[in-house]
Amino acid sequence: MKIAHLPKSVALELTYRCNHKCKFCSCPWDAPTSAYPKGEELTVCDWKKVVEVLYDKGVESFSISGGEVLLKDGFESILRFIRQEGGKRGLDLPIVLISNARKMNEDYIRLFKELNVHLSMSLPGYDTFQEHTGVDNADGVLHWFQVAKRLGLKTTLNVTVTKKNYGELFQTMSLGLINGADDVLLNRFLPGGRGLAHMDELMLTPSQVNGMLDVAEEVLSYANKQGNVGTEVPLCAIKDVEKYKHIHIGYQCAAAKGFFVIDPAGNIRTCNHSPHIVGHAFRKPMIEDIDYWNTFANSEYSPAMCSECAMIKKCDCGCREVANILHGSPKRIDSSIII
């Protein structure tokens, strides 16, 4: 009998609601002509039951997002419960909270400090912020980085890099760090969700991906900070892997291995980018589509064109879920980066 083993980390998407309309958003329920089933959102009590079950199954660390997590009534109670239940088990790992910061306030930041929450806030460009999000709030995001710094809360600057904001990446990263961000997470734009309707205007060229890495290394070296690229890049797409000392690049997919995702209705997916539901938090077993889960859990997805590559054991050939979204199988090519 095939058994699905849950990773140690989970991302809880607490709500579908969002007060931005980001062109690059990869939430599967916002894809054009989406067939993704938006079920009724779990209540706060439901989420507490989910958290307890996950701890009992060996999950140790949590991140929470949406949609926009600050729009979920009672999200504070869920945070407290995660911390409380973790404490019973001797766990005090930071809870990562991902927000666009539009509804942020100082009381929330004080709460995050109290509960050992690591706050990640999105700044997809400065001059192009409104063009990307539909909202004019870049200065608002920078303000909350300042407040978090003053109150001693650790933060991450989250930048989705697109063709539209590529030219201002130096400025965007610099502003985030100057205003108090402790580190940086870069994500190259990936087709998925609402972003499928904006691929031509947002998708980076392979040359721009290398330029993104060069700019990130330059800014981080000046600031003496560290950063990460959160979306996989194939090794063969990078001109000089060895020169990057401050920006850390992911080459392998962590879906169903390092983490998994639970959507607002309790449905389980291998990653936040994926539209493929593999189970539900309240079902037994939780993972029902074992074959799809294990494709990711066991890294059984290398494209045929990469099978003879000497680097195949340390590179997943780009984002496997993009391959599935664009071409119908995680074993196909990630054409967002490999031409």
How should these model regions be labeled?
Residues 2-44:
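Canonical Radical SAM [4Fe-4S] cluster-binding loop centered on the CxxxCxxC motif
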Residues 17, 21, 252, 305, ...:
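The −1 position to Zn-ligating cysteines in a subset of zinc-ribbon hairpins
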Residues 31, 39, 44-65, 72-190:
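Radical SAM/AdoMet-radical enzyme domain recognition
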Residues 43-50, 287-290, 326-339:
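Short microdomains enriched in Cys/His and/or Lys/Arg
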Residues 207-243, 267-317, 321, 326:
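C-terminal accessory region of radical SAM enzymes
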Residues 242-251:
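Short, basic/aromatic recognition patches
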Residues 253-257:
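Short, small/polar residue-rich loop motifs at catalytic or cofactor-binding pockets
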Residues 262-263:
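Short, acidic, Ser/Thr-enriched surface-loop or helix-capping motifs
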